[in-house]
Amino acid sequence: ARLGINAISTCEEAFFPWNSNPTITKEIDDLAKKNGCTISGSGYQDIYWGQLISSIAGSTQTIKKIKGSSSYNVEDYGIALAKAHGAGLSLEDFDKEIASIDRMTDEERQKLINSGEYLPSYMWNVNGWLCSKLGLTVTSQTQKCIPQTYKEDIVSSTLETTVKAGDATGMSAVVTTNTKEGIVIESE
C-alpha cells in the first residue's frame, strides 16, 4: 500500500478483516486510499459464501436464518492448513489445541479482536462480510471448532503419517452470527 501498488491476497482473513482485526485493517485501508491503490482479499469465500449467498438473499422477500456448510479436503491445501485444522490429532489433543481456544466470553474475544491477536476460523470473516453486504447489524458472533473423524485409518501424504480411525481428519468451524434485524447466519 505504501508504494501505491494494487494487491490481492488469498488469505482467508483478508476477505473481510474488519471483524477480526479492525485496527490494522483501518491502517492498511487508510494507507491504500492515501496512495491510490486497492488492497483486497479473495478466494473461495467471496464466490460461494459471499456473492452467491447475497444474490440469493437479494431475491428473497423474508429471511430469518441463513445456514449452510462447505467442506474441502485438507490434503489439498498443505501442511500449514492441515495442522491449523487439527488433522492427525487425537480428540483430546484437538480439544486442548484447537477447540479450547473458542471457549471464552464475548468480552475476552472482543479484547483479542481489538488488540489484533484474535485468530478467526475460516468462516468468521465471511459472516461479517455477509452482514455488511446485506446491511445487517451484528449483535453477537461466536465460533466453535468441531473435529471431523473417520471410521477407518486414513493415510495422509500431507502429514506423512496415517491418521488413526477416530482421530481428527480436520475440523468444521461453526460460526453463528446474530443480528439486530433478527436474522441469524450460521456457517460452517
Where are these regions (language model features)?
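Short amphipathic alpha-helical segments and helix-helix/interface helices
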Residues: 25-29, 54, 127
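Alpha-helical support elements that line or immediately flank enzyme active sites
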Residues: 47-59
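Short secondary-structure capping/turn micro-motifs that flank functional sites
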Residues: 16-17, 48-49, 147
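Short, ordered loop/turn segments at secondary-structure junctions
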Residues: 11-15, 44-45, 71
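Rossmann-fold NAD(P)-binding glycine/threonine-rich loop
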Residues: 2-6, 10-37
